[in-house]
Amino acid sequence: MTNRRNFLKTAGAAMLGAATAGRAAQGAVPEAPIQTSAAMQPPLAPPNGRPYSPVVTLNGWTLPWRMKDGVKEFHLVAEPVVREMAPGMKANLWGYNGQTPGPTIECVEGDKLRIFVTNKLPEHTTIHWHGILLPSGMDGVGGLTQPQIPVGKTYVYEFQMKKSGTFMYHPHADEMVQMAMG
């Protein structure tokens, strides 16, 4: 029979067991390495040119670019994508340049960018550049800061990277559908 005394004993034992298990788990966490030698220090900046190291992208693909009149030019194509999530399990998604997530756009602080976005989706779209300081007309909010990119048309985003960081981009048109599609 359950009474108050038995309930309190059981609850106390359970709390003691949980506290003990938590302490044991903390003891299993390895300590962070201490930088005691030059081998563990980050590499020095190159002696000439811009201090820059290419990133390793998770999806393994960085968007190619060309330099034209001091501006890095990139080309993105918003289009339907079929992605195999597991053997025999395919998903119909929307992405950029044949993949989802889209390719990494690699640049450094101070770079001037020109990004051509061609819409091959079945509806209008835009691109919103999360966290990037840029002119209002380049923010990607269709109908508010820029026109929507109609099906089959190309829109040119042009801005300068004013701060370094890792930022994401995504559609800002019919968001519930377009973000859900990838």
Task: Annotate each predicted stretch with a short phrase.
Residues 2-5, 47, 110:
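Intrinsic-disorder/low-complexity regions
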Residues 15, 62-63, 102-103:
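Generic recognition of flexible, low-complexity loop/linker segments
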Residues 73-182:
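Histidine- and aromatic-enriched segments that form or immediately flank copper-ligand environments
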Residues 1-15:
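N-terminal secretory signal peptides and thylakoid transit peptides that target proteins
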Residues 17-21:
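Hydrophobic h-region of N-terminal signal peptides that target proteins for export
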Residues 15-16, 175:
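Residue-level detector of secondary-structure transition/capping positions
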Residues 22-70:
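C-terminal segment of N-terminal export signals and the immediately downstream linker at the start
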